[in-house]
Each structure stands twice: as C-alpha cells, then as structure tokens.
C-alpha cells in the first residue's frame, strides 16, 4: 500500500480507535497514531488491515477545530488529499488538508457498500446484530471479568475479586488460609483488571519453584498468556528492546532474578500497572535490617500503582511480620510498628460490636455503647430500636444489622487492605481420615543403609534425614540402573493390592521424586497391568494436560495418577478422594500442599489419606511427628511452618538417630506448642474481618447470578452460530464437549487463539473443572471475544437484502432495517463502557419513514425473511434508490434521539455513582486512614474525562437490511 506521512486511515479490525494518522513509514513497517484513544499501532506495509479514508464531493467533513466543510472537489499533493469547499460557519471558500480532519469522525460505510452492490448473505446480517448485542451485554455487566475464568463459583473468592478487582490500582493483602484459593483470587482480580482496562502491564513475582505453577494457572484457568522471564530470556530480549521487560505485557519472574541490580533497575523502569507477589510472608523484615528480597519488593511497590501480596495468615506470621506486609502496601499509613500495635488494640471494641451484630440475639448494652461510640458521627438509634424490638419482620431486622455492620467495616483499620478467610468461617470442606499401613524394612534396604553408614562422608543433618526417608533412592545409588527396588519393596505390594481392591475409585499417588513416580508406574503396569499415568516436572504443559485428562476420564481413563512433588504443584483433582502418600516430605507446608490437591473447596467426598511406611525407620518417626504432634493429616495446620522452624533440629536428629526417649520428648513439646499456637489463633480471630472477607449474602448473590449466566442457552446458540458463519469446524465429542478446528473455507485467513490442531471446548463449568484439557467457553473467553471482533470489526453482515413473503401486505412494499451503534472513542481504562456500552439501536422504517421497531420485534421479523442472491439483491437496491436516500436521513433522526437520551442517562448515572462514591470515601477518610488520596483523585479525574468522552460520543450506522414484500 502507498503510505505517506499525515494520511488518514481507519483500522479494519479496531474501528473503535477512530481516525488514524500515519506518523512513521520505515522499511516494511508503517506506524499509525489514533489520537482519539492515544494509541499507536505498527503494521506491515504489505498486509496492513487498514482502509484509506478519502471523502467524495457532496460529503461533509469536520476539521479538528470543530467546523465543517461541504466538499466540492479534492486535490492531492505529496500523497496528501486536500479538500476544497464551503466553510459551514462563514460560508467562505476554504481548503482542508486531510491531516487536520477530526479524529473522532466515524464512518457510515454500509450505504456505500449497499449502493455498490456489495451485499452480504442474509444470515450474516443476523449474526452481526447478535454479535453487537453480545458485546453490549458483556460491556454493561457489573460482573465483567468474573464469568470467564475456569474456576468453581466459590462465594468468598468471587466476593474478594468483585470488591478488589473493580478498584483503581488495588493495593491489598490476600491472606486466606491454605486451601481457600489465594491464587485463584489473585487470578480473578488480574483477569478483571485486564478485561476492564484498569491494568495492561502486570508483573508477577514468585519463588523459583512456583513459576511453572503460576504460568499453568494463568493460562488454564484465566486464558492469560504470561511469559516466564529468567536471565536467559532477558539476554534474548535485548534483540528487541534495551529493557527486556518491555518486550512482554504479562510477565512472571522469580525474586532471584530481581536481586540483580541491573534487572531490578530495568523492572523499576518498565511502567507496570499491577504487581503481584506470591509467598510474600517469606520477605524478611526488621526495622533495622530488612532483607534484600524485601527491599526489592519495596522498591517495586513504590513505583507500581497496584499491588497484590499473597501471604500466609497474619496469625501464622506474628504481628511484626504482618506489619511489614502492610507497610509495603501503604508506607505512609503504616509507618510505625508501635503505633500499629496501639491501633490494633483499639480494634477490639470494633470486633466485639461486630460479633454481636453478626448474631441473631438482641444486642447487649456493652455492644450498644461500643457502637454508639464507634459510629459517633451517625445517628444509629433507629437501627438499634429495630434490632432490639419484638415482633419486627426478620428481614427488616437483618437489614438494620447489615447496615451497621457495613458502617463498622468502613471504619475498620485494615478492612480495605486485608482479606483473610479461614476454614472456620468458610463452609464446604470435607473431612480427612488418616490410614497408616506399617511394613517391615526389606533386607536390601538395611544392607544399603549399613554400607552407606560405613562409607561415612560429610553430609548435613538434613541430607542424612532425606536419605533415611527414601531408602529406595539410597539402594538404587549402590546398584546399577537395571536394579528395580520396586520388585521387593512391600509398599509397592501393598499399593498394587490396594488399587485392585478399589478398582472403581480414582487414586492420586504422590512421591517426592520424579524417578520414584516413574518406577511406580512401571511396577503397576508390568506386574498387574493397572492403568496409571505419571505427572512430573520433566513433562511439558501439554503432556501434563493429557495425563490429567486421562486420569479424569470416567470411562476408559487411568485409575491412578502418580505425581512427583514438584510435578503436582498447581494441579487439583477434586474428583478423586483417595490420596496415597508413598513417602513423606520434610516440610509441613509441603505435606499440606499434597493433601491440598484433593482437600479443596469443591471436594464432594471425605478424603481418605493412605500412608504405607516402613516400621522402625525415619518414615515412621516423621509420621508420628506429623500425626501426634501436629495432627497434620486430619486437620490443616496453619502453625506448621512456625512449629517446623522451632523444632527442625530436634526433628532431624530424631529422624537420623533412633532414640525413643528423644522422640517422646519431641512429640510432647510439639503437642504442647501446637495447642498454644492454636489457642492464640482462635483468640485472635477477627470476626469483622472475616465478615468482610467472605461477603456473606452479597457473595451468594454474585454466585447465583454467575450460575444463571452459565446456563444461558441463548449465548450458546449465538456462539455456535458465530462459529458456523466464520467457518470453524465443530465436532461433537460427547461429555458436553466440542472439538473446534480451523477449516479451509474459513471467512478469515486466521482466527487468533484457535490452534491449527484444534481445541476441545465445553459450555459446562463442571466438565471444564474436571478436565484440564477442555476450555470453558463463556462470553469472556478469547475465542468468543476474537470471534465477535472478527465480525464486528469487518464488513461482514453490514448489508443485506431479503424477501418477506406476506400476502397481507402489497407486493413491492419496502422496509429498511437499520442498525446503529451508540459509541464513543475512549481508552478502555476510562471505564466509559460502564455507562455508555457499545449499544445497537434498531430502526425499522416503512417507505413513508415511520419507525416500526417498537411494534415488530427483531426475532419474529427475522424468521419470516428469505434470502435473495447477490445479483438480484443489487438490482433491487438500484431500483429502490430514490426511496432509500431519504429513509437513511429519517433513520438517523430517530436513532439520534435515542443516542441523545442514552448519553444523558449515561451522564446522569456516571455523575450519581461516582459522586456518591467520592462523597462516601471523602467522609470515610476522616475516620479511616486506609482511604488513599490516590483513589479520591482518580475518581475526580475520571468524572472529568468521562464527561469529555460523552461529549464526543457519536452515532454510527453499522448494518443495513432492505426488505421487499413478495407474493411469489
């Protein structure tokens, strides 16, 4: 294409960007600036999806200064079109270079296509209209970002995501107990921030071992393609940019990478919108000597607007460590540890009052006095009277309690920055039952242990303990690779018999090492032909998906899945309820992580935990410490990390040297300390914080709405019809799933997101949750979003001609159906769509210019129409031109009235909502310092910007259908 600086073009795929200007032509690339949104796009000159904008004599064009020009002729100089004509205000003869055209101009192209005989198939008009309706529905939903992820509809998770995800630059601490889904909550918030345009560039910092887990979670659950950055990736990226972090929008990296000054400086300079830090409780801090890791995160949190910290519960951490996390979120607010402790102490009255309000009994005098004092600036006596009175409707009393609770929440010290759910406050967890199976130590292992002891060597206590816990590994070290420990290990014999006696059950088996997992699979296959599959860190994501799918399959699937420690990270198998621990990890957190593969919200059965172990060995002693000391098999142990830190040396000594007195002593001390910590945690429970974190009835209402949307048959029909029109092959696979594949006859050369070898999808959430290899299709899924964009961003369905066979109407009667779009060019981050979503406006005109759309609905009208071929359609349009021209003008008049009303309503809604929120936050700031000034300033600026964008809103003709009555 011939490009010149200053020329005006429009994007064929992103028409909402408005009129673009060529700002750079270099080599094979052209750069176009779209001033309406402030965005740049770079295209290949040979294949740019752009259309040159040149007006014709008779057209009216608008300058960037706001005046119009009636075009009489046009000339060209150096590739730039110059329009000549009459100034709309002065009546003078003037010229206007195309470079100075108004960039908010919209292009009503369908008439040009119609009169040029470019007529689409009838069904494409319908699909285009449906696509615009779907875009409107999604953009106007206050649940945008929550429907699409492949996650269970868990109330507390959806509540936190709904509350935090819609904030500007959220800065919060997610501190739920293990198993309650902090990663999912963070993913939901990230997904919501991206879909709503509040964030575009996101950096996730995780421990080295969790990088792959996060990559998988973000892709499989949230359809977000993050890139993992390590030193090698940074070096490779230099070919594209001086700062490697600018080469991707969504990045996962480890703290280790950012400890290097060069990489940290680059990350600090990379203009992120949101920072997410997992395992934030490992960031060590004291006022005198913060750790390097803490300093890295602190530096990033000072320059990145939004921050999510995922951490252990505050009760696990201790107050000082908890304060250190809060300090990262808001150093101005949490500036002094002693002041923080004093403030925490003052919250006890708030918690006591909240406890009373959360119950159903009448309020004691002490609670009423506390409430009156805490909410001193508000008259709460009417609410108190309702709660205390007899014979009052229960719903009315509950509403009064809820109102006062909300007032308390708004004033709670960390209520806006800390979310912490516990198993005590969240229902729906199964019970856990522990089953142990002792076996005699094989002679081969005893011999290997003796030889190892004689050989000596300088090994750390931890290395000796690890060796004692895995005798099969020690044995293999002294034998050649052909030796097979599984041929004599009694735990393997037990496992085979267990699987044979539980043929109908799915069994998850976890071992520490990938080599152990592979050997177990070989043993099951060669000795008994038991169907099992393996899951370890040496496999690719696709291989793991296939293994997980094979295990999940009810008919013909694997009975057992054998995982290594690292390989099982980030994968959950709630459809299984039997867990075999072939060995035990040294760390209580890893043990909980193993059990957590099954013990999650959504598990429908009680969990049976099975441990085959070798008697009188380190395996038995570690089992006793976990079971008798921590009760870690049958209950979650939030204090496990603390207890292991305190007793690690004693435990390692007991594992390495068999001393029954030392073991008894260790178990007694551990039990005693465990009870102390548990009691302290129970005493420290913050009822108000729990209420705020799980959302109560509001959370349930969100989940109910999402569940109703899941069963939307209209959406399913529309999406399948969309794929039909585009030309995607669809094969019914059974089990509520469809295989989608690109076909040779697709309407578009590529369908971004649709793999060449196809993808299996389902509209059923339960099916998607049980199968990692099946994508959950909702309106938010990229395959749906891309499909909508392909249709609405192209000319597909913009013109159509149809025949209406109806003898009640005179033959030759003409109707003109016009679909307009009320839209405005604005960056996604402005949130304009919340008030003025892209809205299709339907006008149905008879030949006299009367609008019949209110009397004749779209669906019933559409069913009566028959298609005509393109050639005949073109002739009918040509013959009808004298009637059509005035109808277009009339249709625009009708639609403009609707748009003006919509803009007025949008302005009123925006002003009411944002003013109310601003007023609320301003008044709260006086009593709760957690209200950040940045949030208030953002709301003020947003109101100004939105008014500007609403002023620039325009009407765009999107599609035309001409209908003629025939009796033939």
Swiss-Prot record:
Boundaries of every Helicase ATP-binding domain copy: 163-332
Residue numbers binding ATP: 176-183
Assembly behavior: Interacts with the RNAP. Has a higher affinity for the core RNAP than for the holoenzyme. Its ATPase activity is stimulated by binding to RNAP.
Molecular function GO labels: ATP binding; DNA binding; helicase activity; hydrolase activity, acting on acid anhydrides
Its job: Transcription regulator that activates transcription by stimulating RNA polymerase (RNAP) recycling in case of stress conditions such as supercoiled DNA or high salt concentrations. Probably acts by releasing the RNAP, when it is trapped or immobilized on tightly supercoiled DNA. Does not activate transcription on linear DNA. Probably not involved in DNA repair.
Alphabetical list of InterPro entries matching this protein: Helicase_ATP-bd (IPR014001), Helicase_C-like (IPR001650), Helicase_RapA (IPR023949), P-loop_NTPase (IPR027417), RapA_C (IPR022737), SNF2-like_sf (IPR038718), SNF2/RAD54-like_C (IPR049730), SNF2_N (IPR000330)
Protein name: RNA polymerase-associated protein RapA
UniProt KW Transcription keyword: yes
Broad class of enzyme this protein falls into: hydrolase
Disulfide bonds: none
Keywords annotated in UniProt: Activator, ATP-binding, DNA-binding, Helicase, Hydrolase, Nucleotide-binding, Transcription, Transcription regulation
Record carries keyword Translocase: no
EC number: 3.6.4.-
Transmembrane feature ranges: none
SUPFAM superfamilies on file: P-loop containing nucleoside triphosphate hydrolases
Record-level GO BP terms: regulation of DNA-templated transcription
Location of the Helicase C-terminal domain: 491-655
Listed Pfam families: Helicase_C, RapA_C, SNF2-rel_dom, Tudor_1_RapA, Tudor_RapA
Annotated motif DEAH box, positions: 278-281
Family assignment from sequence similarity: Belongs to the SNF2/RAD54 helicase family. RapA subfamily.
């Amino acid at each position: 294409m011939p490009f010149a600086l200053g020329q005006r073009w429009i994007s064929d795929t992103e028409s909402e960007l408005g009129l673009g200007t060529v700002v750079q032509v270099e080599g094979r690339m052209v750069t176009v600036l779209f001033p309406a949104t402030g965005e740049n796009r770079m295209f290949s000159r040979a294949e740019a999806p752009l259309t040159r904008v040149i007006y014709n004599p008779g057209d009216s064009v608008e300058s960037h200064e706001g005046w119009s020009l009636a075009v009489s002729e046009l000339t060209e100089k150096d590739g730039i079109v110059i329009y000549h004509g009459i100034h709309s205000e002065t009546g003078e003869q003037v010229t206007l270079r195309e470079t100075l055209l108004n960039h908010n101009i919209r292009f009503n192209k369908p008439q040009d296509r119609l009169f040029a005989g470019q007529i689409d198939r009838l069904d494409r008009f319908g699909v285009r209209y449906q696509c615009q309706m779907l875009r409107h529905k999604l953009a106007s939903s206050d649940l945008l970002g929550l429907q699409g992820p492949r996650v269970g509809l868990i109330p507390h998770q959806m509540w936190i995501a709904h509350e935090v995800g819609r904030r500007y630059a959220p800065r919060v601490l997610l501190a739920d107990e293990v198993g309650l889904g902090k990663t999912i909550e963070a993913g939901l918030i990230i997904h919501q921030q991206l879909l709503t345009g509040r964030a575009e560039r996101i950096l996730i910092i995780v421990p080295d071992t969790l990088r792959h887990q996060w990559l998988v979670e973000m892709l499989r659950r949230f359809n977000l393609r993050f890139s993992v950055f390590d030193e090698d990736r940074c070096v490779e990226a230099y070919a594209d940019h001086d700062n490697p972090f600018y080469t991707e929008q969504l990045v996962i990296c480890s703290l280790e990478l950012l400890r290097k000054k060069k990489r940290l400086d680059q990350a600090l300079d990379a203009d992120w919108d949101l920072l997410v830090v997992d395992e934030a409780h490992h960031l060590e801090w004291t006022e005198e000597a913060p750790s390097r890791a803490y300093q890295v995160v602190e530096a990033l949190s000072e320059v990145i607007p939004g921050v999510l910290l995922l951490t252990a519960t505050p009760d696990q951490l201790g107050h000082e460590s908890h304060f250190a996390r809060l300090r990262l979120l808001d150093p101005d607010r949490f500036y002094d540890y002693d002041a923080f402790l004093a403030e925490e102490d003052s919250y006890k009255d708030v918690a006591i009052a909240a406890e009373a309000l959360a119950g159903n009994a009448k309020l004691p005098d002490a609670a009423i006095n506390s409430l009156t004092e805490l909410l001193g600036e508000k008259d709460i006596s009417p609410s108190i009277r309702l709660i205390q009175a007899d014979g009052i409707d229960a719903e009315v009393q509950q509403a009064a309690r809820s109102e006062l609770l909300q007032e308390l929440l708004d004033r709670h010290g960390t209520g806006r920055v800390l979310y912490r759910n516990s198993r005590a406050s969240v229902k729906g967890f199964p019970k856990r039952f522990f089953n142990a199976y002792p076996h005699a130590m094989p002679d081969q292992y005893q011999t290997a242990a003796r030889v190892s002891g004689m050989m000596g060597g300088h090994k750390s206590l931890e290395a000796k303990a690890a060796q004692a816990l895995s005798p099969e590994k020690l044995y293999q070290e002294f034998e050649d690779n052909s030796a097979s420990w599984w041929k004599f290990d009694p735990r393997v014999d037990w496992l085979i018999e267990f699987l044979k006696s539980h043929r109908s059950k799915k069994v998850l088996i976890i071992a520490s090492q990938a080599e152990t997992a592979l050997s177990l699979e070989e043993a099951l296959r060669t000795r008994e032909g038991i169907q099992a599959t393996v899951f370890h860190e040496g496999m690719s994501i696709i291989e793991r998906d296939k293994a997980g799918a094979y295990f999940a399959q009810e008919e013909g699937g694997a009975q057992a899945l054998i995982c290594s420690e690292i390989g099982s990270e980030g994968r959950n198998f709630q459809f299984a309820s039997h867990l075999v621990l072939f060995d035990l990890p040294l760390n209580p957190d890893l043990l909980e992580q193993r059990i957590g593969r099954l013990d999650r919200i959504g598990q429908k059965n009680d969990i049976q935990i099975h441990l085959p172990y070798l008697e009188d060995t380190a395996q038995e002693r570690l089992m006793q410490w976990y079971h008798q000391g921590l009760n870690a098999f049958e209950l979650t142990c939030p204090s496990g990390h603390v207890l292991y830190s305190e007793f690690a040396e004693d435990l390692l000594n007991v594992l390495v040297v068999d001393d029954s007195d030392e073991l008894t002593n260790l178990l007694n001390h551990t039990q005693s300390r465990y009870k102390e910590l548990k009691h302290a945690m129970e005493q420290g429970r913050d009822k108000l914080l729990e209420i705020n974190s799980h959302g109560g009835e509001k959370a349930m209402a969100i989940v109910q709405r999402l569940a109703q949307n899941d069963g939307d048959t209209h959406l399913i029909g529309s999406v399948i019809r969309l794929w039909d029109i585009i030309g995607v092959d669809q094969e019914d696979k059974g089990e509520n799933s469809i295989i989608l594949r690109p076909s040779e006859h697709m309407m578009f050369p590529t369908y971004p997101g649709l793999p060449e070898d196809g993808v299996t999808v389902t509209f059923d959430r339960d099916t998607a949750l049980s199968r990692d290899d099946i994508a959950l299709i909702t309106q938010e899924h990229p395959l749906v979003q891309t499909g909508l964009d392909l249709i609405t961003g192209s000319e597909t369905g913009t013109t159509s001609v149809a025949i209406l066979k109806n003898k009640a109407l005179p033959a030759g009667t003409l109707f003109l159906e016009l679909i307009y779009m009320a839209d405005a060019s604005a960056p996604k981050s402005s949130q304009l769509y919340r008030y003025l979503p892209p809205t299709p406006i339907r006008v149905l005109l008879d030949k006299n210019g009367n609008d019949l759309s209110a009397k004749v609905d779209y669906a019933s009208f559409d069913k009566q129409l028959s298609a005509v071929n393109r050639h005949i359609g073109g002739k009918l349009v040509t013959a009808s031109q004298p009637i059509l021209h005035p109808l277009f003008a009339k249709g625009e008049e009708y639609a403009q009235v609707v748009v003006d009303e919509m803009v007025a309503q949008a302005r009123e809604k925006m002003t009411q909502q944002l003013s109310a929120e601003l007023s609320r936050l301003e008044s709260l700031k006086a009593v709760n310092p957690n209200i950040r000034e940045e949030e208030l300033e953002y709301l003020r600026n947003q109101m100004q910007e939105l008014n500007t964008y609403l002023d620039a809103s325009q009407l765009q003709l999107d599609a035309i259908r001409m209908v003629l009555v025939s009796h033939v």
